[in-house]
From Swiss-Prot:
Function: Component of the ubiquinol-cytochrome c reductase complex (complex III or cytochrome b-c1 complex) that is part of the mitochondrial respiratory chain. The b-c1 complex mediates electron transfer from ubiquinol to cytochrome c. Contributes to the generation of a proton gradient across the mitochondrial membrane that is then used for ATP synthesis.
Transmembrane annotation, as ranges: 33-53, 77-98, 113-133, 178-198, 226-246, 288-308, 320-340, 347-367
Topology of this chain in the membrane: Multi-pass membrane protein
Cofactor note: Binds 2 heme b groups non-covalently.
Family designation: Belongs to the cytochrome b family.
Lineage of producing organism: Eukaryota, Metazoa, Chordata, Craniata, Vertebrata
Protein name as annotated: Cytochrome b
Keyword terms, alphabetized: Electron transport, Heme, Iron, Membrane, Metal-binding, Mitochondrion, Mitochondrion inner membrane, Respiratory chain, Transmembrane, Transmembrane helix, Transport, Ubiquinone
Single GO cellular component term: respiratory chain complex III
């Protein structure tokens, strides 16, 4: 078997990626989230496949088909709640994975980092179109509000919105194409994930110290396969606890009501994992400005490799930037909270302050702290 896995054309790829891969000996549990994201993607594709067997993408039957899955299909309720809460687990792992990349300076591996940003955007798009499929009140109005933002684009905006809708409002054509997008996008994510891994294995993994670890590498298997299995076990434990005991805790009560174009919900809001970006969107009074800020809130991650002037990789020995980093995380949590609040004082003002802080930290404060720390090293 040893010779086979090293010489067989297919097994050789697996061997170099997951078995004999030289890995830094000191990577911590924060490095587990890549494999957890892979596990989440597998869970989402499998549960989604079984849901697609019973779901109908028609405005008249979509809502009742979801109810049918929960009531009449064997373990349909479990598959549905694993899929819905699996999305939340996916985004928790995603945010931690990106946060770890920022903290330990993994963005210096720019190809891997940029593919990661594309993966994040694709996952967000997949989750958005998926949220529309149950055709509840929040599904319908969320789709209407978010797709309508494209009308802010000069000249082509209105045409673009009608083109995406497939008509003059969110209707049957919209639901059908959103189902098609939701089905195909996870496979595109899987393809991008392989490219992400390909670029990562070209350079090798980063490690908590930020130092070159070429002289201290160990094989991925069995050391990190066991470690990843523990992470996967804990992830499944949390996911099953969510799906079995608190299945609707992260959902919106409005989505238990079938979509009604004539009745607008009091507060239209997306799923919790989009709330930080939604808060940034709402904090700008101008429509086009809000849309640009929304897009920039994710694309600004691409600025990290460009704005990096530090002589050290990672924040482990940089207390000034560490402090700013944790303020940034706290600010993100504030934005998430504000995104779920009504548009009224004092929430609008807090949202505006938090939005300005979000961009200021990335573009101004972190580069300044890098320079300060570089000068301290010279002393």
């Amino acid at each position: 078997m040893k010779i086979l896995r090293k010489n067989h054309p297919l097994l050789k790829i697996v061997n170099h990626s997951f078995i004999d891969l030289p890995t830094p000996s000191n990577i911590s549990s924060w490095w587990n989230f890549g494999s957890l994201l892979g596990m989440c993607l597998v869970i989402q594709i499998l549960t989604g496949l079984f849901l697609a067997m019973h779901y109908t993408s028609d405005t008249t039957t979509a809502f009742s088909s979801v109810a049918h899955i929960c009531r009449d299909v064997n373990y349909g309720w479990l598959i549905r709640y694993l899929h819905a809460n699996g999305a939340s687990m996916f985004f928790i792992c995603l945010f931690i994975h990106v946060g770890r990349g920022i903290y330990y300076g993994s963005y210096v591996l720019s190809e891997t980092w940029n593919i990661g940003i594309i993966l994040l955007l694709t996952t967000m798009a997949t989750a958005f179109v998926g949220y529309v499929l149950p055709w509840g009140q929040m599904s319908f109005w969320g789709a209407t509000v978010i797709t309508n933002l494209l009308s802010a684009i000069p000249y082509i905006g209105n045409t673009l919105v009608e083109w995406i809708w497939g008509g003059f409002s969110v209707d049957k054509a919209t639901l059908t194409r959103f189902f098609a997008f939701h089905f195909i996008l996870p496979f595109i994510i899987a393809a991008f994930a392989l490219v992400h891994l390909l670029f990562l294995h070209e350079t090798g993994s980063n490690n908590p110290s930020g130092l070159n670890s070429d002289s201290d590498k160990i094989p991925f298997h069995p050391y990190y396969t066991i470690k990843d299995l523990l992470g996967i076990f804990l992830l499944l434990l949390i996911l099953m606890a969510l799906a079995l005991f608190f299945p609707d805790v992260l959902g919106d009560p409005d989505n238990f009501t079938p979509a009604n174009p004539l009745n607008t919900p009091a507060h239209i809001k997306p799923e919790w994992y989009f709330l930080f970006a939604y808060a940034i969107l709402r904090s700008i009074p101008n429509k086009l400005g809000g849309v640009l800020a929304l897009i920039l809130s994710i694309l600004i991650l691409a600025a990290f490799p460009l704005l990096n002037t530090s002589k050290q990789q990672g924040l482990i020995f940089r207390p000034v930037t560490q402090t700013i980093y944790w303020i940034f995380i706290a600010n993100l949590l504030v934005l998430t909270w504000i995104g779920g609040q009504p548009v009224e004082y004092p929430f609008t003002m807090i949202g505006q302050i938090a939005s300005v802080t979000y961009f200021t930290i990335i573009t101004i404060l972190i580069p300044i702290s890098n320079t300060i720390e570089n000068n301290i090293i010279k002393l």
